[in-house]
Amino acid sequence: MSDQKKNILSTPMTRAEALRSMVAGVVAGAFGLSACSEPKRTEQVTIAGKGGRVSLKRNPRNGDEVSLLGFGCMRFPTVGGDRYTGRIDREPTREMLEYAYERGVNYYDTAWMYHRGDSEGMVGEVLKQYPRDSFFLADKMPPEAKTLEQAKEIFATQLQRCGVEYFDYYLCHSISRQYVFQNLYLNEGVLEYLLEEKRRGRIRQLGFSFHGDLALFEWLLALPVEWDFVQIQMNWLDWRDETRISEKLYNLLAERELPVIVMEPIRGGSLIDLPQSVTTMLRENDPAMTAAAWALKFCASYPYVLTVLSGMSRMEHVVENCDTFTDFQPLSDEQIELLHRAAEQYRNNTRIDCTDCLYCMPCPYEVDIAGIFRTYNRCFDDQLLPNPDSAHDEEYLRRRRVLLNRYKNNVKPDGRAERCIGCNQCSPKCPQSLHIPTELKRVEELVERVRQEWK
């Protein structure tokens, strides 16, 4: 064990002090950017950015100097549809990736299924212009693989798509059920194959991304495998939520001194447009800090977090997030506690815990699951969900009108919730463990009830 890690484990210190002992801030000359389209986020973003390079974190297991901000390559801008139906809008995506690289982002996370297989090629196309030892590329073995031969073919294709000879970080993707892991990775021998690829040097660090329960997590860590890192969902809203267990997962990894890669730090964007009461709490503490910065800094303020992935879809997201991690300073313990209080305030409302990952898609009956949940949650975030049991005053009528108009404009008639027959093929795919037909029924009943009152 390194002296640095021994100190972190053995010396009493605050969470902020522990992080400062591991973070290396790297500052360089300013890098400008011309203005682009109006930000989608509700808070003002300075497109030019403040310049400088994002701070680095040293991986104590192998010495990698990894940017605290990692580029999640699942939410690139698209044309002709969304991430499932459209294709990557290549020029703005290239500009975003190049800007991030120039600002010091050196960790790029892609996967077989992202953008229907086009993410890997897009990332490889951009990164090939840079020295191979100047960035870290992460890819994943998809759940779609069923046999060892399929896994070998997929791995070879991934290297080819990305235009590289090795992956710096490679993951068993989206582990959520023990029998699935046993069938593919143990019975089919795919885990041993990946370990062999690691011995050959085509995988430098091997880990897994996780979406299951605590028992499965402990079982995975108990396997006779030397995992190099683990990727978990982590955000301030779910941290102390017993149904989400993210705090317990992090603590188990910290006990084993395993580097943590964070996914969904902004919860699929749902921690951007916060309820007004929560926004007020945070702004009273720091009027200049955006909701995205609060979410990203929360995750990076834990000492065993190596990098925080953000699935950025607009240039202003990239600029803002790079600014957040330039000359990075962790949140204070008081600010961490403020976020815990904010989470309690947030949970006083009811929201559908969808992160818009699209893993549930496509629906065999063409229900636009993500679009329905997105519309419902946006009304919730804007505090515009109508309550049919409340007084039918002007405010209720306004909320009813907003919900029905948004539902009509954002969800096509042949993709609405009433088309769900409850086959439940979608729920096992959901990383948030949602029972999707139940949530669709909830939306359908609300929409239908206020629609009947409209007549």
Region locations from a protein language model:
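N-terminal binding-site loop/beta-alpha segment at the start of enzyme catalytic domains
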Residues: 2-135, 178, 193, 199
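Twin-arginine (Tat) signal peptide motif
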Residues: 10-19, 357-360, 420-426
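Conserved, mostly hydrophobic/aromatic
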Residues: 59, 71, 108, 123, ...
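Acidic (Asp/Glu)-rich catalytic clusters
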Residues: 61-63, 124-132, 159-164, 220-225, ...
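Short, acidic/polar
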Residues: 86-100, 148-161, 212-220, 292-295
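Active-site groove signature of glycoside hydrolases
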Residues: 162-180
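Beta/alpha (TIM)-barrel catalytic core signal, keyed to glycine-rich beta->alpha loops juxtaposed to Asp/Glu
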Residues: 175-374, 381-403, 428-429, 433-438
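Short Fe-S-cluster ligation motifs
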Residues: 384-423, 452-455
